[in-house]
């Protein structure tokens, strides 16, 4: 089957056609021809879409799906359909399933179940057994089975020595270690950003300091051990500064930010809407501005949806009792496109995350695999619960 894309603006800094409007013929999964105009003849489907833009396929590095164990939240099949509909050709699935993705067989199960689907699935395996932070999981075996990185989703590694050993051990096979930026002792039982709003609303606060201390610890360890460290979903201005300074020292550290942390503040909590209860918590306008600048400066490498669907029974309750998490795949592009330059978004969703996580990126050139995302940067829509797959 062949498809002809008419008048598509190519956004791909690795392509010789970057920022050019071209016709693109795709045949048998590969880009057969790119030209100013390709005649609309032959046995292929012609797509003429308003303000069509294309880029290398989007890759989301932090997606939670409910299978196995929490299928009431989202099944693997449904989650992959949502990703494809939202423009993502690849996703990395977090280890917070039940049982936890902490073994070779668990990694293989997910890869086999997602085989031959529209969206590629890459497991991020647990760093520790059952994500309890007590004993390192069999990292090498899981890497050989297809795991692309190792981290306990939203669970910080409290044991300093265990984190040190993980960073050292992973170097034997060029493994990427993830460390969630939160110090549990400082965070305590907090459920919202510590500040004026949490005080006014009577909500227990989580100081940004809890994030800073954990990041500082991990950077000290990384400086000692070497290796590669990725810090997922940072949320505060000081975190940007810490990581930027570490990069200047030459440390192999990267980080991501969730799309919602680029646009939403803790002012949203005045409605006590539990859909805004996230980990890390929504922070301040000053933090948002620093995060946006961090993307522009290169201190922040990746934008993720941090998609984490929660069933209504655990969301439609009192704010203090609700589980953290929100759906993000469907809205990530629309949200971030309102506050960032298009090329910054594309870079942080394509070339940068693929390079960091070791996924091949296919430039938009003739002969390459057609791993592409289609979008309209000027399109508008209102996302409602009726749109949820």
Model-inferred region functions:
Residues 8, 29, 51, 62, ...:
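Divalent metal-coordination and catalytic microenvironments
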Residues 200-226, 296-297, 302-303, 308-378:
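His/Asp/Glu-enriched, well-ordered alpha-helical/loop segment
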Residues 38-54:
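Active-site metal-binding motif and surrounding structural segment of the metallo-beta-lactamase
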Residues 276, 319-320, 381-389:
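Short, surface-exposed loop/helix-turn segments at secondary-structure junctions
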Residues 137-303:
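Histidine/acidic residue-rich metal-binding segments in metalloenzymes
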Residues 113-127:
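A glycine-rich helix N-cap at a beta->alpha junction
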Residues 50-114:
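Metal-associated gating/positioning segment near the N- to mid-region
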Residues 1-41:
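N-terminal metal-binding scaffold of metallo-dependent hydrolase/deaminase domains
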